Amino acid sequence: VYLNGNKSFMTNAVNSKYMLCVARNAADDPSLRENRSKFSMWWVPLRDDEGNLTPGISMEPLEKIGWNMGNTCELHMEDVVLEEKDLVGVEGNGFMQAMVNFEVERLIACAQSLGAAECAFEDATHYATQRVQFGKPIGKNQLIQEHITEMYMKIENMRNWVYKTAWKIDNGEPVQIDSAVAKLYCGRAAFEVCDTALQVMGGIGYTK
């Protein structure tokens, strides 16, 4: 089996030894190439034990304006040799297998959003107790207290969505809807919490 094509936005590719790739048979009728049943999932070795890239694979790191704790790359594959045993699951079922994986990945994204919101909340509340204006900490002002309350409320809602969805996954319950709604809410709420934290901290919130 020879794998050809490109894979964009692969997280931590620089540090990964393997990747999962969903691909179709190049010999398929072009009119059927978008058919979901034509995609299969493959286990692709990225590098050997010495760290050398697999022949036929090259990668380019992408520069991002944020999320710099992990690298993101674009991969190029040209006649990468795979064996039949590298097929993951059932041939032609790769798309549906990926969709099932996405349910767990959505939960991971929710947990990341929750963590970012909690960090912003901690920084903002600490600053509100330390920054003194007109003889008292700004946290004594009702507007700041309202901001902190709103942030806390959203974080608790985010945490409940994460725990509820994780509990369902652990108990083998379907989470197609829960994981999608959780990702939507947690991503939106995390942005709102971080934005509010910036308002509480003022200009200092924009510094490193």
What are these regions (language model features)?
Residues 1, 74-76, 90-93, 99-208:
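Alpha-helical interface subdomain recognition
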Residues 35-37, 60-65, 88-97:
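Short intrinsically disordered coil segments
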Residues 4-57:
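A short core secondary-structure module
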